[in-house]
Amino acid sequence: MQLVFASNNKNKILEIQSMLPESIKILSLSDIGCHEDIPETANTIEGNAILKANYVTQKYGYDCFADDTGLEVEVLNGQPGVFSARYAGEQRNDNDNMDKLLTELDDKTNRNAQFKTVICLNINNKQHLFTGIAKGNIVKNKIGNQGFGYDPIFQPEGYQYTFAQISLEEKANISHRGKATRALIDFFKN
């Protein structure tokens, strides 16, 4: 089965493809000729996932799934949240985003945070949502060089290392995206 993943983010595509059964082949947006930016104008993570999946299904006619992920920091009332990718500006620079967040948390003792991923699957004219959450905290300095996004500053609950210090396989077992993707996989098994 071929399924479009409404993304051109190579890191996300690799992470999700590594978790799916071999019988499901992921096509990226560029694989189907979609080169435009898909609007992410919703004010929730769920809303952005739905917008992206609906865009591909309606404009290109493919069954597809889309995800949106946000880092929600407790003391910042859930920010950066839906703005996580462009927290420090529209250029979407991971280091700038982390630096801005670390500066905002510099004098804070409460560094509790969670990553939230929502996957919206449009298949056979039906829509399904799958959510994954990874609780943890924001460390004071960037640690590790694996992963992407906020991985170097997010320490999952119960662990002594950041997401950027572990392998893709280990991260998939405990991450927000891993949990949401396993829910998606379970859907296909049933």
Curated annotation (Swiss-Prot):
<protein>
    <recommendedName>
        <fullName>dITP/XTP pyrophosphatase</fullName>
        <ecNumber>3.6.1.66</ecNumber>
    </recommendedName>
</protein>
<keyword id="KW-0547">Nucleotide-binding</keyword>
<dbReference type="GO" id="GO:0035870">
    <property type="term" value="F:dITP diphosphatase activity"/>
</dbReference>
<feature type="binding site">
    <location>
        <position position="68"/>
    </location>
    <ligand>
        <name>Mg(2+)</name>
    </ligand>
</feature>
<feature type="binding site">
    <location>
        <begin position="148"/>
        <end position="151"/>
    </location>
    <ligand>
        <name>substrate</name>
    </ligand>
</feature>
<comment type="similarity">
    <text>Belongs to the HAM1 NTPase family.</text>
</comment>
<dbReference type="GO" id="GO:0036220">
    <property type="term" value="F:ITP diphosphatase activity"/>
</dbReference>
<comment type="subunit">
    <text>Homodimer.</text>
</comment>
<dbReference type="GO" id="GO:0000166">
    <property type="term" value="F:nucleotide binding"/>
</dbReference>
<comment type="function">
    <text>Pyrophosphatase that catalyzes the hydrolysis of nucleoside triphosphates to their monophosphate derivatives, with a high preference for the non-canonical purine nucleotides XTP (xanthosine triphosphate), dITP (deoxyinosine triphosphate) and ITP. Seems to function as a house-cleaning enzyme that removes non-canonical purine nucleotides from the nucleotide pool, thus preventing their incorporation into DNA/RNA and avoiding chromosomal lesions.</text>
</comment>
<dbReference type="GO" id="GO:0017111">
    <property type="term" value="F:ribonucleoside triphosphate phosphatase activity"/>
</dbReference>
<dbReference type="GO" id="GO:0036222">
    <property type="term" value="F:XTP diphosphatase activity"/>
</dbReference>
<dbReference type="GO" id="GO:0005829">
    <property type="term" value="C:cytosol"/>
</dbReference>
<feature type="binding site">
    <location>
        <begin position="176"/>
        <end position="177"/>
    </location>
    <ligand>
        <name>substrate</name>
    </ligand>
</feature>
<dbReference type="InterPro" id="IPR002637">
    <property type="entry name" value="RdgB/HAM1"/>
</dbReference>
<feature type="active site" description="Proton acceptor">
    <location>
        <position position="68"/>
    </location>
</feature>
<keyword id="KW-0546">Nucleotide metabolism</keyword>
<dbReference type="GO" id="GO:0046872">
    <property type="term" value="F:metal ion binding"/>
</dbReference>
<dbReference type="Pfam" id="PF01725">
    <property type="entry name" value="Ham1p_like"/>
</dbReference>
<feature type="binding site">
    <location>
        <begin position="7"/>
        <end position="12"/>
    </location>
    <ligand>
        <name>substrate</name>
    </ligand>
</feature>
<keyword id="KW-0479">Metal-binding</keyword>
<feature type="binding site">
    <location>
        <position position="69"/>
    </location>
    <ligand>
        <name>substrate</name>
    </ligand>
</feature>
<feature type="binding site">
    <location>
        <position position="171"/>
    </location>
    <ligand>
        <name>substrate</name>
    </ligand>
</feature>
<dbReference type="InterPro" id="IPR020922">
    <property type="entry name" value="dITP/XTP_pyrophosphatase"/>
</dbReference>
<keyword id="KW-0460">Magnesium</keyword>
<dbReference type="InterPro" id="IPR029001">
    <property type="entry name" value="ITPase-like_fam"/>
</dbReference>
<keyword id="KW-0378">Hydrolase</keyword>
<dbReference type="GO" id="GO:0009146">
    <property type="term" value="P:purine nucleoside triphosphate catabolic process"/>
</dbReference>
<dbReference type="GO" id="GO:0009117">
    <property type="term" value="P:nucleotide metabolic process"/>
</dbReference>
